[in-house]
């Protein structure tokens, strides 16, 4: 159980992140009934939030999306519940990468949008981006489409059901008659290696363990694991990026293990991809890493959030 204090600055978070100042959960509990039911009232009149409870995390994320972005989002049972601060840090970094391009219309690809479709919804709502949300799990597709419809985002977001989850872009691009150009892709890859005896035990093929999460772990096995873990998944994106240099301007991905960053950078170097940028996403006690690469001549913006 975590006692909450509003108006505290969270060190290291992106300066434009609305959650950099911790929300006043006591006020939020008064305003949002479903969230209030997951809170515990302390003797001093303040509320405590148990971040290790999955149901609490669901109501917390739903409440924050409604409060800050007027988004009504639901999650499929047993699916990944995204933490908003981290997703915002990723979106804000993409904004920073897009800024030098000075483009009026921006199109992005959300690889594995999940049931919430949160990245696409945030990108569309916050920036008016046109998003292609890719997803292979039927239940997630159903919920993602409903989330888009509920928030009247059909004109900005297309949820595409990938028939084959062994490829990233191929299925959609082969049937895309318009041959649209995309300015970026984003990805929150499955962290864990399904080849391991205990894939959700925290280990990847890298000997360094991923730090245990402070929040309750949510998500289906399909969302959290894949063959080879996040390194092999991202390498597949890199391989396909070589075939789609003209379709996507900037390729990006998040990583959950710091030691995997140099492994991805080495793989890009082996393939002679020189235009590369890295960053870190800080949100409270949790840090994630991200890598961007491009085949265009304009250097990618460097720096961390």
From Swiss-Prot:
SUPFAM superfamilies documented for this protein: S-adenosyl-L-methionine-dependent methyltransferases (SSF53335)
GO molecular function ontology, one term from the record: mRNA m(6)A methyltransferase activity
Region annotation (Disordered) ranges: 197-221
GO cellular component, one term: nucleus
UniProt-listed Pfam families: Methyltransf_10
The keyword Transferase is assigned to this record: yes
Gene Ontology BP term (one): rRNA base methylation
Top-level class of the enzyme under EC nomenclature: transferase
Residues binding S-adenosyl-L-methionine, per UniProt: 87, 112, 135, 166, 188
E.C. designation(s): 2.1.1.346
Keywords assigned: Methyltransferase, S-adenosyl-L-methionine, Transferase
The reaction(s) this protein catalyses: adenosine in U6 snRNA + S-adenosyl-L-methionine = N(6)-methyladenosine in U6 snRNA + S-adenosyl-L-homocysteine + H(+)
Function noted in UniProt: RNA N6-methyltransferase that mediates N6-methylation of adenine of U6 small nuclear RNA (U6 snRNA).
Entry similarity comment: Belongs to the methyltransferase superfamily. METTL16/RlmF family.
PANTHER family noted in UniProt: RNA N6-ADENOSINE-METHYLTRANSFERASE METTL16, SAM-DEPENDENT METHYLTRANSFERASE
Protein name (Swiss-Prot/TrEMBL): U6 small nuclear RNA (adenine-(43)-N(6))-methyltransferase
Biological source species: Drosophila melanogaster (Fruit fly)
């Amino acid at each position: 159980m975590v006692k909450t204090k509003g108006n505290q600055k969270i060190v290291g978070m992106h300066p434009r992140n609305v959650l950099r100042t911790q929300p006043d959960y006591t006020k939020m509990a008064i305003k949002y009934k479903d969230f209030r039911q997951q809170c515990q009232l302390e003797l001093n009149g303040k509320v405590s939030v148990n971040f290790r409870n999955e149901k609490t995390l669901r109501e917390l994320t739903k409440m924050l999306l409604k409060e800050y972005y007027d988004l009504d989002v639901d999650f499929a049972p047993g699916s990944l519940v995204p933490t908003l601060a981290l997703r915002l840090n990723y979106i804000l970094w993409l904004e920073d990468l897009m800024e030098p391009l000075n483009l009026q219309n921006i199109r992005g690809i959300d690889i594995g949008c999940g049931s919430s479709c949160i990245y696409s919804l945030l990108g569309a709502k916050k920036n008016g981006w046109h998003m292609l949300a890719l997803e292979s799990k039927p239940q997630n597709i159903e919920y993602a489409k409903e989330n888009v419809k509920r928030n009247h985002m059909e004109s900005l977001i297309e949820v595409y059901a990938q028939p084959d989850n062994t490829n990233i872009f191929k299925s959609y691009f082969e049937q895309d008659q318009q041959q649209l150009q995309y300015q970026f892709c984003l990805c929150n890859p499955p962290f864990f290696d399904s080849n391991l005896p205990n894939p959700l035990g925290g280990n990847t093929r890298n000997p360094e363990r991923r730090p245990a999460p402070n929040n309750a772990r949510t998500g289906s096995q399909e969302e959290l694991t894949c063959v080879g873990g996040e390194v092999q998944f991202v390498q597949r994106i890199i391989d396909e990026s070589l075939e789609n240099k003209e379709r996507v301007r900037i390729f990006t991905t998040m990583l959950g293990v710091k030691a995997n960053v140099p492994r991805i950078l080495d793989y890009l170097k082996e393939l002679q991809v020189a235009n590369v940028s890295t960053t870190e996403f800080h949100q409270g006690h949790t840090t994630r890493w991200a890598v961007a690469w491009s085949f265009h001549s304009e250097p990618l913006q460097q720096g961390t959030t």
